[in-house]
UniProtKB/Swiss-Prot annotation:
Catalyzes the transfer of a dimethylallyl group onto the adenine at position 37 in tRNAs that read codons beginning with uridine, leading to the formation of N6-(dimethylallyl)adenosine (i(6)A). The keyword Cell cycle does not apply. This is tRNA dimethylallyltransferase. The record marks S104 as: Interaction with substrate tRNA. Its EC number is 2.5.1.75. One of its GO terms (biological process) is tRNA modification. One of its GO terms (molecular function) is ATP binding. Its cofactor is Mg(2+). It comes from Parasynechococcus marenigrum (strain WH8102).
Length: 299
């Protein structure tokens, strides 16, 4: 009798949907570590602004693929896959299962469908030029040159915008036309969270970020890596930086962070519904539902 392929469980959902709390419960039930698939949590020193699992949570359940690089060392999708795939394989070999958790849709899609992005090494000089141009110019440029990539990449996502332009410059072809896919040797069970009160949860998340020290973390990052660090233009950090520079007050920073987060969550929802087929878990009973689905897939 043929042995079934090992099982990869993915827990996905928009930001502030409760993935961290549920992932800890599932991980403890199954005695599994959590494999991070949140693109900003890959970077060191970005803890508060990315709502990275706390030291207490990481002591409770081991986490992989956190704090891989310094913030001034961008990680390409291909580099992330090179780190993530062996990590998944190790868990599958030792435990027969792996648990992926995150809201970065493209990163999840790459791991679950075997998407292979073009193998283009980083172009340091080009990245410097693009940083000098600024995201306000670079993203419209990408939309013109590669409309497919431009539609998928958020206007404030300088890291992925630069990467798409980098591939276009190096190969002469849009990044969106070069990706191929080879299905990985494992089964995938996708579990999704999308609570009805997400707007309220996002406001609470924003309040928590600022009370937990987002502004101080931003100040330290700016002093160490420079205010032009692309990751300091992402949600939360961009507003905290303007607050530090005196161009925005606290009330406006809070409001804009909440607004940008809600816009981002809307894009995440669209991506997950178009690119994935998760079992959407109902609030209040999500843990029981998740465990039932997992047990069914293990039979």
């Amino acid at each position: 009798m043929t042995q079934p392929e090992p099982l990869v469980i993915t827990l996905l959902g928009p930001t502030a949907s409760g993935k961290t709390a549920l992932s800890l419960e599932i991980a403890e039930r199954l005695n599994l570590p959590v494999i991070n698939v949140d693109s900003r949590q890959l970077y060191r020193e970005m803890t508060v602004g990315t709502a990275k699992p706390t030291a207490e949570q990481r002591a409770r359940v081991p986490h992989h693929l956190l704090d891989l690089r310094n913030p001034d060392q961008p990680i390409t999708l291909q580099e992330f896959q090179a780190e993530a795939e062996p990590c998944i394989q190790r868990e599958l070999q030792s435990r027969g299962m792996a648990l992926l958790v995150g809201g970065s849709g493209l990163y999840l899609k790459a791991l679950t469908s075997g998407l292979k992005p073009p193998a283009v090494p980083p172009q340091a000089q080009l990245r410097e030029q693009l940083s000098q141009l600024g995201q306000a110019i670079c993203h419209p440029l990408l939309q013109q040159a590669d409309p497919t990539a431009g539609a998928k990449i958020a206007p404030a996502d300088a890291v992925r915008t630069q990467r798409a332009l980098e591939v276009l410059y190096a190969t002469g072809r849009p990044m969106s036309s070069q990706a191929t896919a080879t299905p990985p040797p494992w089964r995938v069970l996708e579990l999704g969270l999308d609570p009805a009160n997400l707007r309220q949860r996002i406001q609470q998340r924003t309040d928590q970020l600022y009370s937990d020290g987002l502004v101080e973390e931003t100040r330290q990052l700016s002093e160490r890596y420079g205010a032009d660090l692309p990751l300091l233009q992402t949600i939360g950090y961009g507003e905290a930086l303007q607050l530090l520079e005196g161009t925005m007050n606290q009330a406006k920073a809070n409001r804009i962070t909440t607004q940008r987060t809600r816009q981002f969550a809307k894009r995440q929802r669209t991506w997950f519904r178009r690119q994935h087929q998760p079992h959407w878990l109902a609030p209040a009973t999500e843990l029981d539902q998740a465990m039932t689905l997992i047990e069914q897939h293990l039979r």
